[in-house]
């Protein structure tokens, strides 16, 4: 299916690109999430008329994400969990826990934006975690897991 991208999509293209994707990906993900539109002749003309407005909105979102990223970059987040004597946690610290802690501090972060390359944190100590605020803005946050002995 031919689609017009209404915003930058990772591994696919930028705003305004006409790309070919599988029908299910377009119908079930890109179009419902307002990231793309079916590329018909009328849709292409309408997009070209609104192109400046959409580019302005994309630039505003990027600027807002960069401002949020400057506040968030280098932040150390402290979370406490029950742990054994050897420093292993009973349970783990997931991206949901980190997103909830950042939201409690006043940042708008969803759990899908928290990137944990090694999976959930299962030991006490400092762990680097990436937070992706925008497709072009990613910041590093240090999560300090404190152990509560049982």
UniProtKB/Swiss-Prot annotation:
Gene Ontology MF terms: rRNA binding; structural constituent of ribosome
Keyword list, A-Z: Ribonucleoprotein, Ribosomal protein, RNA-binding, rRNA-binding
GO biological process: one example: translation
GO (cellular component) term, any one: ribosome
InterPro entries (alphabetical): Ribosomal_bL9, Ribosomal_bL9/RNase_H1_N, Ribosomal_bL9_bac/chp, Ribosomal_bL9_C, Ribosomal_bL9_C_sf, Ribosomal_bL9_N, Ribosomal_bL9_N_sf
Any single Pfam family the record assigns to this protein: Ribosomal_L9_N
Function of the protein: Binds to the 23S rRNA.
PANTHER family according to UniProt: 50S RIBOSOMAL PROTEIN L9
Family: Belongs to the bacterial ribosomal protein bL9 family.
Annotated protein name in UniProt: Large ribosomal subunit protein bL9
Source organism: Ralstonia nicotianae (strain ATCC BAA-1114 / GMI1000)
């Amino acid at each position: 299916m031919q689609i017009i991208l209404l915003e930058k999509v990772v591994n696919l293209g930028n705003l305004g690109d006409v790309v070919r994707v599988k029908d299910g990906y377009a119908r079930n993900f890109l179009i419902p999430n307002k990231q793309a539109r079916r590329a018909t002749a009328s849709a292409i003309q309408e997009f070209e008329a609104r192109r400046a407005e959409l580019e302005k909105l994309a630039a505003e979102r990027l600027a807002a994400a960069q401002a949020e990223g400057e506040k968030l970059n280098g932040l150390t987040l402290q979370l406490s969990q029950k742990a054994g004597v050897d420093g292993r946690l009973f349970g783990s610290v997931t991206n949901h826990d980190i997103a909830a802690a950042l939201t409690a501090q006043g940042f708008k972060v969803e759990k899908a934006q928290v990137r944990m390359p090694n999976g959930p944190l299962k030991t006490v100590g400092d762990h680097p975690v990436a937070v992706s605020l925008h497709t072009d803005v990613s910041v590093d946050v240090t999560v300090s897991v404190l152990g509560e002995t049982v």
